[in-house]
């Protein structure tokens, strides 16, 4: 398999874990590809840490909804809001997570040990220091799935 195909392969496999109607939180990076691979007939509600309930697929440059300056995901990449979606404040947002209302979360990681412990909190000098809502999601979501390449080189 070509390196360029690996992330899509992982996202497609992750999408198979979802059921129609699931409330899903997607971490930054690879997890944002998952909506592009949802099985036919499976519609999910995408919850975003920045307060979007019912986020749309990540738009690409040239798409009608592409606007890199107004709606972004937790990683700062362009995002969209699905028809009927909306925005909530941070307290309500984390109330959804901590209250057990998220069916599944998909997180990226730096590494995972043999017991499944997740390390994703910092790479010195990189853009995204800190774990964001990962702690809350690991505890509050009904299922937590780490999606990442096996090695830094794929």
Indicate residue ranges for each PLM-predicted region.
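Conserved phosphate- and dinucleotide-binding cores of soluble alpha/beta proteins
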Residues: 2-9, 60-154
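N-terminal active-site beta-alpha-beta segment that forms phosphate/nucleotide-binding
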Residues: 1-82
């Amino acid at each position: 398999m070509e390196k360029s195909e690996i992330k899509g392969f992982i996202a497609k496999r992750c999408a198979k874990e979802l059921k129609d109607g699931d409330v899903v939180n997607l971490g930054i990076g690879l997890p944002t590809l998952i909506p592009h691979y949802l099985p036919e007939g499976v519609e999910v509600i995408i919850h975003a840490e920045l307060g979007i309930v019912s986020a749309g697929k990540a738009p690409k440059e040239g798409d009608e909804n592409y606007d890199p300056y107004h709606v972004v995901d937790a990683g700062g990449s362009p995002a969209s809001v699905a028809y009927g979606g909306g925005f909530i404040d941070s307290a309500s947002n984390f109330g959804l997570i901590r209250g057990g209302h998220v069916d599944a979360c998909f997180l990226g990681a730096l590494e995972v040990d043999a017991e499944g412990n997740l390390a994703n909190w910092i790479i010195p000098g990189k853009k995204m220091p800190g774990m964001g809502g990962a702690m809350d999601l690991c505890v509050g979501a009904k299922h937590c799935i780490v999606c990442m390449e096996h090695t830094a080189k794929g």
